[in-house]
Amino acid sequence: MRRLPGLFPCTGVGSLPHLDPGPAVREVVSRFPEIPYWPQLPRRTPLEHMYPQYAATLPGAWISGGKLSMRSGEELLPEAEVFYELFLSGDLSPFAIPPERAAGLAGLLSAAAGPFPAVKGQVTGPVSFGLMVCDREKKPVFYDPVGRDVLVKYLLRVAQWQAAQLTRLSETVVLVIDEPYLASMGSAIVSLPGEEVIAVLDEIFEGLPGTVCGIHCCANTDWGLVLSSKTRYLSFDAYEYADSLLLYAEDVAAFFARGGVLAFGVVPTAAEAIARETAETLADRMETILDKLSARGIPRDDIVGSAVITPACGLGTLPEGTAERALRLCEGLSSLLRARYGRRSP
């Protein structure tokens, strides 16, 4: 797989609180020149929330009262037939994310000079999408075979379209699927066999062979299950949940052995923590995490050589100034860790 640039490069997770995509994109590119990402801007419009944002041409979908729903079963079949014909054609243009639903993506593509060493995008994952979006009977569409299959294949095409757009900025594209519902796996809320979860995740990953594909989950989950997928990039909340990953040291070691990238979300997303922390305190926290992983038998060089620095999650609910401080903390932490390890990115 493609290697990401430099040592401890930094990038973002997704959302920013800005209303204007121009300043948001400029902030991202200035702070993360090695791996810029397109910022989601949910305060601009409800259409930039994590489910409607990717549903512009989703078969059987409608929005009522600000809520996205989707037809399922026999009711979906006529639209599903049309969709499958379009899917098999290989044409990606019908799956474009319109600028009104992704102003940050449009802004990055039009304003960023590039080329960059790498560039990152994101899409809501099929598990979370399918469990959050319901049909007329208020049943999550993931539990309907027709709805699930259409949804997974639709999101695959959206991801492929996005990756194709981002190659205009870099040969190395990181495409991360956001899966908050993985934190509910095994609970009374979500009763899904693990193999079904992995099957839909891998359908996305297998359809993006030239892309560094990944998963973001900003809470605790069954990391062994997640790492059994074909993900090449794991983004997690290392500020709050780093110790949970220690329980899966063998899985993490195997992930590194196959060239995986671990994105440490070690910069907090709570306003009070952002105000309190500094690059120095976060570097010490990161060193503690590295010590613990090394103590579990994972070579420190493997971790350091594959680490990316990010915020723990999106920053869209924060004041602009606080979110921008979090980005500066990522930038400062990245620089400090490079200095500590005596190397600089090329």
At which residue positions do the language-model features occur?
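Alpha/beta catalytic barrel-like cores
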Residues: 1-144, 228, 260, 278, ...
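Glycine-rich beta-strand-to-loop/alpha-helix junction loops that act as flexible
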Residues: 124, 178-180, 310-313
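Short, flexible coil/linker segments at or flanking structured domains
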Residues: 4, 9, 26, 214, ...
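Soluble or luminal CAZymes and related metallo-dependent hydrolases
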Residues: 20, 100, 104, 147, ...
